[in-house]
Swiss-Prot record:
Entry's Gene Ontology cellular component terms: cytosol
Full protein name: Alanine--tRNA ligase
Protein role: Catalyzes the attachment of alanine to tRNA(Ala) in a two-step reaction: alanine is first activated by ATP to form Ala-AMP and then transferred to the acceptor end of tRNA(Ala). Also edits incorrectly charged Ser-tRNA(Ala) and Gly-tRNA(Ala) via its editing domain.
GO terms of biological process kind: alanyl-tRNA aminoacylation
Free-text note regarding domains: Consists of three domains; the N-terminal catalytic domain, the editing domain and the C-terminal C-Ala domain. The editing domain removes incorrectly charged amino acids, while the C-Ala domain, along with tRNA(Ala), serves as a bridge to cooperatively bring together the editing and aminoacylation centers thus stimulating deacylation of misacylated tRNAs.
Family designation: Belongs to the class-II aminoacyl-tRNA synthetase family.
Organism lineage string: Bacteria, Bacillati, Cyanobacteriota, Cyanophyceae, Synechococcales
Keyword field: Aminoacyl-tRNA synthetase, ATP-binding, Cytoplasm, Ligase, Metal-binding, Nucleotide-binding, Protein biosynthesis, RNA-binding, tRNA-binding, Zinc
Disulphide-bridged cysteine pairs: none
PANTHER family on file: ALANINE--TRNA LIGASE, CYTOPLASMIC, ALANYL-TRNA SYNTHETASE
Residues holding Zn(2+): 564, 568, 666, 670
Classification via Pfam families: DHHA1, tRNA-synt_2c, tRNA_SAD
Gene assigned in the entry: alaS
Catalytic activity: tRNA(Ala) + L-alanine + ATP = L-alanyl-tRNA(Ala) + AMP + diphosphate
Length: 886
């Protein structure tokens, strides 16, 4: 045991360091925190300290060491409604953990946990309560006999509380939890561990000793494991003697900064105000780590979680009467608090603040209008808001559904979630119909039988031609014995030279043949590493179990290889020219072009595009070799190889390396030297969603074809405009100036025509007391001319005039225009042109708006024009009469 003279760790940094130092002294390998974006496609975010070790626990990856310890950053949003409300709920938190992979077990785990909390953290035994699984007599005995915990301090709980499992089947085991008792003077009778004011669970020891089969039966694991977790924020609350986690040195500086911005004092604030301040403190830590780890705000996946947190912060800022931008101030405090432990925060600070500012400005642009709609819904008195309205808030004003629910629930109003889902699905269907994507889904018996086949051996890295045995044939989604002439089929071989579509690269084209039979292959789909060769039988027939020849189209393969290598070079260039945080969000390596999606908060400038293009072309001309090797995954990542987020990799990975330029995990095909790419040209750069940009580019012969086509276009323009290519800009500029002058002349003539049409109207104005009223139909005038006419007439008739004009600007287009103009006297009396024009245009299936003194609208139903003008005449006649009587 260590001497208790050692100083007690107090600050969050000291508590974290003491934990890791302690377990390092027990021969644990200290593992740095993994990203919040896990290397596990089944999980969106790192939600637990053990998640990075999940492949080790499941036997899918070699253990880094028999013993390990870490401080892992984690993020959960399942209890987001409790954040700031309770003393201990968070989205972002740090989990301190020690792990054993088939090494030590219960005795050591319990002894070391006790040594840590009593000798290092100096917690008093009388403040500690232990819980155990009621059937785990072994753990209870260790606590009682080895540690000396009296039976009254050991609480037996059932499987719901003290038995961990990874799912319905698989590794599982009992756990033992350590609780801190804030009020030990209340005694040990009738202890209720659910009493959150008295007890806090701060250390959980999981003893992974069983495997549960599909029948629910438990059997002993060959290797027993230890998985523990201690919440850093909870231990800080205990050691710093705070009433909640938010008042520890880990979060309070952010909370105080938020209070300073809001010009209030945290400690003297009421509970509702404190909740908003705590939410800002919690969410700040979450957003800076999400952005630093590469997440960009969007409406999908992790990006949606980030956007939801950011917009929730802005909303709580509004509740604190903060109107201006403020999130970057909180983020700066959060970064300064954590940058020593997480240096990436300091390195990525500029990008973090930029992303926050962009998203904050984006939401503020629509926040006022969205809040107005929300307030209208609340004032309506309805207790169930339609899914249509909730979707409008989401789609038009950027309110995440959860934020809308949260705001309305504060007023005891519910949201029609099924209706919202229907609206969302309808939007997806509209998008799907518009995109006209090719369906490569496996259907029918293919989907059912695919698992019956062995994985296809791919031989296409070294040769475009090979032999393989036909293992399966599918026609119209059904398994058949042979493929005959004219049929479109899917063929499965035991081995092939065809590349199957994956990693963004399209599948090869070519032929499968045998004697006089031949199949034209137009695409190859990969499903669970089984290759389906899709094509049409051009002649003869091919049967199952026959030996066939595979011949890949070398020209298409060469174009794909060129585009794939160019894609790797492009990503490296973007990281150097734009920002090192740029990472791939999607790609397509085709025969005729390449497409690369990446995170960027703003469009690339023309200069940046030119720099990226030039850098890629310089690497091409330098004739770098392409080195391909298989490596241990961890070694490859340590060497700097880039991995695609969300991709699942095995222990051994294929690495494509352009030494000194690019290094990526990649299963695709590539050229042998960069000079084989030939040349590179970016043809477009666009935004495809919030924070995500897309580059389309060409390489090799396709670049020459592109310039040839442009040259032909330039020559045609030269002939058309009767100017040499070098004079085209000058000629076009001259034509544009000419066009502007012609348009001005046309508008002048329109104004003259309009004047002739309306000039006589002022003399026919109806007098109602001291007021003048003109309501008339004038056809053939566009919106600008109709507006000029109304304003000119109002000016002539004075501040007690009303002018309403409606007409058909173009009989072929069959639409209506309306304008309403009020004199100043009528505006002072409360009349509003915008409101009136809405009523008028609605009669003709239209709509519009404007200011109190002037408004305009459009409409579709030209047959209702007279009805609309008559409605206006009657309405205004009565109002003007009432004003004249006063």
């Amino acid at each position: 045991m260590k001497s208790q003279s050692q100083a007690t760790p107090i600050t969050g940094d000291e508590i974290r360091k003491a934990f890791l130092d302690f377990y390092e002294s027990k021969s644990h390998l200290i593992i740095p925190s993994s990203s919040l974006i896990p290397d596990d496609p089944t999980v969106m975010l790192t939600i637990a300290g053990m998640l990075p070790f999940k492949p080790v626990f499941l036997g899918l990856r070699n253990r880094p060491s028999p013993r390990a310890s870490s401080s892992q950053k984690c993020l959960r949003t399942n209890d987001i409604e409790n954040v700031g409300v309770t003393a201990r709920h968070h989205t972002f938190f740090e989990m301190l953990g020690n792990f054993s992979f088939g090494d030590y077990f219960k005795k050591e785990a319990i002894q070391w946990a006790w040594e840590l909390i009593t000798d290092i953290y100096h917690l008093k035994p009388e403040n500690i309560i232990i819980s155990v699984f009621h059937e785990d007599h072994e753990s209870e005995k260790i606590w009682r006999d080895n540690i000396g915990i009296i039976p009254e301090r050991i609480i037996r709980l059932d499987e719901k509380d003290n038995f961990w499992s990874s799912g319905a089947t698989g590794p599982c085991g009992p756990c033992s939890e350590l609780y801190y008792d804030f009020n030990p003077e209340k005694g040990l009778k009738n202890i209720d561990l659910e009493d959150g004011d008295r007890f806090i669970e701060f250390y959980n020891l999981v003893f992974m000793q069983y495997n549960r089969d599909s029948n629910g039966m438990l059997s002993d694991l060959k290797f027993k494991n230890i998985d523990t977790g201690m919440g850093l924020e909870r231990m800080a609350q205990i050691l710093q003697k705070k009433t909640n986690n938010y008042e520890t040195d880990l979060i309070l500086p952010i909370v105080k900064e938020a209070a300073l911005i809001a010009n209030i004092d945290y400690f003297s604030s009421d509970d509702r105000t404190k909740i908003s301040l705590k939410i800002l403190g919690d969410h700040t830590r979450a957003i800076i780590h999400l952005i630093s780890d590469g997440v960009v705000a969007s409406n999908l996946g992790r990006g949606y979680i980030l956007r939801r947190l950011l917009r929730r912060m802005i909303r709580h800022g509004r509740l604190l009467a903060i109107k201006d931008d403020f999130l970057s101030r909180l983020a700066s405090i959060g970064i300064s608090l954590m940058q020593n432990t997480y240096p990436d925060l300091k390195n990525n600070k500029e990008r973090i603040l930029r992303e926050i500012n962009i998203e904050e400005k984006r939401f503020l642009e629509t926040l006022d209008r969205g809040e107005k709609l929300l307030n209208d819904l609340i004032r309506s008195g309805e207790k169930l808001i339609s899914g249509t309205k909730a979707f409008e808030l989401y789609d038009t004003y950027g309110f995440p559904l959860e934020l809308t629910k949260e705001i309305l629930e504060e007023k005891n109003i519910n949201v029609d979630l099924e209706g919202f889902t229907r609206e969302m699905e309808a939007q997806k269907e509209r998008a799907k119909a518009a995109s006209q994507k090719i369906d490569l889904t496996l259907k029918g018996s293919i989907e059912r039988e695919i698992d019956l086949f062995d994985q296809t051996i791919f031989e296409g890295y070294d040769s475009l031609n090979s032999q393989g045995i036909v293992k399966g044939i599918f026609f119209e989604s059904n398994s058949v014995e042979k493929a005959i002439q004219g049929q479109t089929v899917q063929i499965i071989l035991d081995q092939t030279s065809f590349y199957g579509e994956s990693g963004g690269q399209v599948g090869d084209t070519g032929t499968i043949s045998r004697n006089d039979a031949e199949i034209d292959i137009d695409k190859v789909i990969r499903k669970k590493n089984i290759f389906l060769h899709c094509g049409t039988v051009r002649k003869g027939e091919i049967c199952r179990n026959q030996l066939v020849e595979t011949r890949v189209d070398k020209f298409n393969r060469a174009k794909a290889e060129s585009n794939h290598t160019a894609t790797h070079l492009l990503q490296s260039a973007l990281k150097l020219i734009i920002d090192k945080s740029v990472s791939q969000r999607g790609s397509l390596v085709g025969f005729n072009k390449l497409r690369f999606d990446f995170n960027s908060p703003q469009p690339l400038s023309k200069e940046q595009i030119s720099q990226v293009e030039s850098l890629v072309n310089s690497w091409i001309s330098e004739n770098h070799p392409i080195e391909v090797k298989n490596m241990d995954k961890d070694d490859a990542l340590k060497a700097g190889a880039l991995a695609m987020f969300g991709e699942k990799y095995g222990d051994i990975v294929r690495v494509v390396d352009v030494p000194g330029v690019s290094m990526e995990l990649c299963g695709g095909t590539h050229v042998q030297t960069t000079s084989e790419v030939g040349s590179f040209k970016i043809i477009s750069e666009i935004g495809i969603s919030s924070g995500i940009r897309r580059i389309e580019a060409l390489s090799g012969q396709l670049v020459l074809d592109y310039f040839k086509e442009r040259d032909e276009t330039v020559n045609k323009l030269s002939d058309l405009l009767k100017a040499r290519p070098s004079q085209l800009f000058e000629r076009i500029d001259s034509l544009q100036t000419e066009l502007v002058n012609k348009n001005k002349e046309i508008q002048r003539m329109k104004d003259e025509i309009a004047y002739f049409k309306y000039s006589s109207l002022s003399s026919s104005a109806k007098k109602i007391g001291s007021f003048s009223l003109i309501i008339n139909q004038i056809d053939g005038l566009d919106g600008s001319s109709l507006q000029s006419a109304a304003l000119d007439l109002t000016s002539k008739l004075g501040d007690k005039s009303v002018v309403i004009l409606g007409g058909i600007p173009d009989t072929e287009k069959k639409k209506l225009l309306f304008v309403v103009s009020f004199g100043d006297d009528l505006v002072r009396r409360g009349m509003h042109a915008g409101k009136l024009i809405n009523e008028i245009s609605r009669i003709c299936s239209g709509g519009g708006g404007g200011k109190p003194n002037f408004a305009q609208a459009g409409a579709k139903d030209i047959d209702k024009l007279n009805d609309a003008l008559e409605y206006a005449r009657k309405d205004l006649w009565e109002k003007l009469l009432s004003y004249s009587d006063k």
